[in-house]
């Protein structure tokens, strides 16, 4: 269990969480597509669109963060020992969500 608490695994979990939350909007978008209109009201429309965009940008930021993390791990392995910690990964993920 403790071996699973690496920076890479924390980023992967964050990406999976963002994608799972994005799939929660799919039923609403499917109904909208099939009916050709939005039957759920204005407030739910704004909530679903907000969740969808929020998770889309979080996924993009997380993928960029993972790319930078891999770059540091491969190109600067000595510096990576200090930088790639679970605590730093959690801090970066919180910033991605905000």
From Swiss-Prot:
Entry's transmembrane regions: 10-34, 46-68, 89-98
Protein name: Mu-type opioid receptor
Subunit field text: Forms homooligomers and heterooligomers with other GPCRs, such as OPRD1, OPRK1, OPRL1, NPFFR2, ADRA2A, SSTR2, CNR1 and CCR5 (probably in dimeric forms). Interacts with heterotrimeric G proteins; interaction with a heterotrimeric complex containing GNAI1, GNB1 and GNG2 stabilizes the active conformation of the receptor and increases its affinity for endomorphin-2, the synthetic opioid peptide DAMGO and for morphinan agonists. Interacts with PPL; the interaction disrupts agonist-mediated G-protein activation. Interacts (via C-terminus) with DNAJB4 (via C-terminus).
Residues that bear Phosphotyrosine: 71
Cytoplasmic topological intervals: 1-9, 69-88
Record topology, Extracellular segments: 35-45
InterPro entries: GPCR_Rhodpsn, GPCR_Rhodpsn_7TM, Opioid_rcpt
Naturally occurring in which organism (per UniProt): Cavia porcellus
Keyword Transmembrane helix: yes
Localization, UniProt: Cell membrane; Cell projection, Axon; Perikaryon; Cell projection, Dendrite
Role, per record: Receptor for endogenous opioids such as beta-endorphin and endomorphin. Receptor for natural and synthetic opioids including morphine, heroin, DAMGO, fentanyl, etorphine, buprenorphin and methadone. Also activated by enkephalin peptides, such as Met-enkephalin or Met-enkephalin-Arg-Phe, with higher affinity for Met-enkephalin-Arg-Phe.
GO molecular function term, any single one: neuropeptide binding
Cited Gene3D superfamilies: Rhodopsin 7-helix transmembrane proteins
Family to which the UniProt record says this protein belongs: Belongs to the G-protein coupled receptor 1 family.
Keywords assigned by UniProt, alphabetized: Cell membrane, Cell projection, Endosome, G-protein coupled receptor, Lipoprotein, Membrane, Palmitate, Phosphoprotein, Receptor, Transducer, Transmembrane, Transmembrane helix, Ubl conjugation
Membrane topology, as annotated: Multi-pass membrane protein
Post-translational modification (record): Phosphorylated. Differentially phosphorylated in basal and agonist-induced conditions. Agonist-mediated phosphorylation modulates receptor internalization. Phosphorylated by GRK2 in a agonist-dependent manner. Phosphorylated on tyrosine residues; the phosphorylation is involved in agonist-induced G-protein-independent receptor down-regulation.
GO cellular component entries: axon; dendrite; endosome; perikaryon; plasma membrane; synapse
Example GO BP: adenylate cyclase-inhibiting G protein-coupled receptor signaling pathway
């Amino acid at each position: 269990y403790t071996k699973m608490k690496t920076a890479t695994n924390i980023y992967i979990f964050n990406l999976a969480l963002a994608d799972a939350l994005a799939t929660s909007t799919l039923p609403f978008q499917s109904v909208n597509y099939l009916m050709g209109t939005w039957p759920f009201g204005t407030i739910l429309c704004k909530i679903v669109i907000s969740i969808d965009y929020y998770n889309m940008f979080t996924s993009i930021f997380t993928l960029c963060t993972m790319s930078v993390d891999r770059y540091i791990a491969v190109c600067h392995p000595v510096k990576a020992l200090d930088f790639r910690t679970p605590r730093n990964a959690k801090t970066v993920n919180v910033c991605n969500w905000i």
